[in-house]
């Protein structure tokens, strides 16, 4: 609610006149915001509790709806707070929001969406078919568990080019010789 409070302070608006809030985030962040258990996201079956409940027929969507009061938001107490649906596992509501923003389900042409962060989501599709995948990317940025190589720091190779003569040229962060 801190960012929302800051945004409200930046605009001349009475927070009690805010009646709708939309919340998106990766599966874990969205579920934490709505005080859902995230236990099942971090281990097998790697799915939100809302996905599991939907598969069991206990709900018809992975969307969540609460009130401003229950979410402790500085808005009208009866404001509807929507959590957009999770697509699957680690492809969360933020990815669903991207798909809505570009109108992917209405497009004839192929559309690609990349959300690069701790988990990277890749979505490719159009109105005929949509494919989505997620993979952990944090270790690649942080240098975690790298057996050969290094984090993205000075001395790390950031670009490899092959010219017409068959010679490789390396781009190195910070210039100089790669470590």
Walk through the language-model features, giving the residues of each.
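Nucleotide/phosphate-binding catalytic cleft detector across ATP-hydrolyzing
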Residues: 1-21, 26-112
């Amino acid at each position: 609610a801190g960012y929302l409070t800051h945004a409200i302070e930046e605009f001349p608006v009475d927070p009690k006149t805010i009646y709708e809030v939309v919340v998106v985030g990766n599966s874990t962040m969205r579920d934490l915001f709505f005080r859902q258990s995230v236990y099942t996201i971090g281990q097998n079956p790697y799915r939100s509790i809302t996905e599991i409940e939907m598969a069991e027929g206990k709900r018809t969507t992975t969307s969540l709806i609460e009130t401003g009061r229950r979410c402790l938001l500085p808005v009208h107490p009866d404001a509807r707070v929507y959590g957009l649906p999770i697509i699957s596992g680690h492809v969360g509501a933020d990815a669903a929001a991207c798909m809505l923003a570009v109108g992917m389900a209405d497009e004839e042409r192929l559309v690609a969406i990349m959300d690069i962060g701790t988990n990277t989501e890749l979505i490719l599709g159009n109105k005929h078919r949509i494919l989505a995948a997620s993979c952990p990317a944090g270790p690649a940025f942080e240098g975690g568990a790298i057996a050969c190589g290094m984090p993205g720091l000075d001395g790390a190779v950031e670009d490899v080019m092959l010219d017409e003569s068959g010679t490789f040229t390396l781009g190195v962060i910070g210039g100089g010789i790669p470590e």
